[in-house]
Amino acid sequence: MMLKPSIDTLLDKVPSKYSLVILQAKRAHELEAGATPTQAFKSVKSTLQALEEIESGNVVIHPDPAAKRAAVRARIEAERLAREEEERKIKEQIAKEKEEEGEKI
């Protein structure tokens, strides 16, 4: 029985079979958690879907893990700052409305 995608095809995409297993497991967990798929799948199982994405080249190992972690931290920080700015604007709007309401009375 021939499995698709084949291990030979997949090993052309990643440096070692150990890296392949880790990448597949991480991507399968992401898909299970609701991550957006990068393509239409033939397979139903998330583990096989992850292999399909790896085979097509849509999912790769980041060449510099430290840079990836830094990018993730920067994105999280930017999201936090955006939320804080939005909260500040809402509080300012509420204060302005209360002030206008006080002038009307």
UniProtKB/Swiss-Prot annotation:
Q: Provide GO CC annotations from the record.
A: DNA-directed RNA polymerase complex
E.C. designation(s): 2.7.7.6
GO annotation (BP), single = DNA-templated transcription
Report the enzyme's class at the first EC level: transferase
Q: Which family does it belong to?
A: Belongs to the RNA polymerase subunit omega family.
What HAMAP family has UniProt attached to this entry? RNApol_bact_RpoZ
Q: What's the subunit arrangement here?
A: The RNAP catalytic core consists of 2 alpha, 1 beta, 1 beta' and 1 omega subunit. When a sigma factor is associated with the core the holoenzyme is formed, which can initiate transcription.
In terms of PANTHER family, this protein maps to: DNA-DIRECTED RNA POLYMERASE SUBUNIT OMEGA (PTHR34476:SF1)
Q: What is the recorded name of this protein?
A: DNA-directed RNA polymerase subunit omega
Q: Which organism is it from?
A: Streptococcus equi subsp. zooepidemicus (strain MGCS10565)
The major lineage groups are: Bacteria, Bacillati, Bacillota, Bacilli, Lactobacillales
